[in-house]
């Protein structure tokens, strides 16, 4: 699994003009699933994301975890497995097929306690980066 994690002041996701997920301060997690991923990778990713110490403490030092006063918005993102080593058109053969990816995306969202986008839908994601702080996590 790959997750692109961004610290945000706010984030939301819309499908067909309707907001399906929205958070205040917290993390936006763009999540991609590979063919070899399973439940263990989803669990490991969720543990890692929720333990990340990417929020400022009282002294302005990045050392606080998510905690109870921040939220997560998780959006499926198969394009994280896009390969552009040959040519200019990305190949997505490194991404899991939807039938394999969707249950793992659902599990990861559940474990993260996240608001979520709609798997497989064309979505509009809006966010306000905080920092910015952006991390790539691979399991």
Regions found by a protein language model. Name each.
Residues 110-128:
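Divalent-metal-activated hydrolytic enzyme cores
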Residues 3-5, 134-135:
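Short beta-strand scaffold segments in enzyme catalytic cores
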Residues 5-13, 21:
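N-terminal intrinsically disordered, cationic/polar leader segments
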Residues 125-138:
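C-terminal edge-of-domain segments
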Residues 78:
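Glycine/small-residue-rich phosphate/adenosyl-binding loop
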Residues 45, 75, 133:
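Residue-level signal for inorganic ion chemistry
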Residues 19-69, 82-110, 115:
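Compact, glycine-rich, soluble single-domain proteins
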């Amino acid at each position: 699994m790959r997750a692109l994690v961004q610290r945000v002041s706010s984030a939301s996701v819309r499908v067909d003009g309707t907001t399906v997920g929205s958070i205040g301060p917290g993390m936006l997690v763009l999540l991609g699933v590979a063919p070899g991923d399973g439940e263990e990778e989803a669990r490991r990713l969720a543990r890692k994301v929720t333990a990340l110490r990417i929020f400022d403490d009282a002294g302005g030092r990045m050392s606080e975890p998510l905690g109870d006063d921040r939220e997560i918005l998780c959006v499926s993102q198969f394009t994280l497995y896009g390969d552009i080593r040959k040519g200019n058109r990305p190949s997505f053969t490194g991404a899991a097929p939807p039938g394999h990816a969707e249950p793992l995306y659902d599990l990861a969202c559940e474990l993260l306690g996240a608001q979520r986008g709609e798997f497989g839908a064309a979505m509009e994601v809006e966010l306000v980066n905080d920092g910015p702080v952006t991390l790539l996590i691979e399991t």
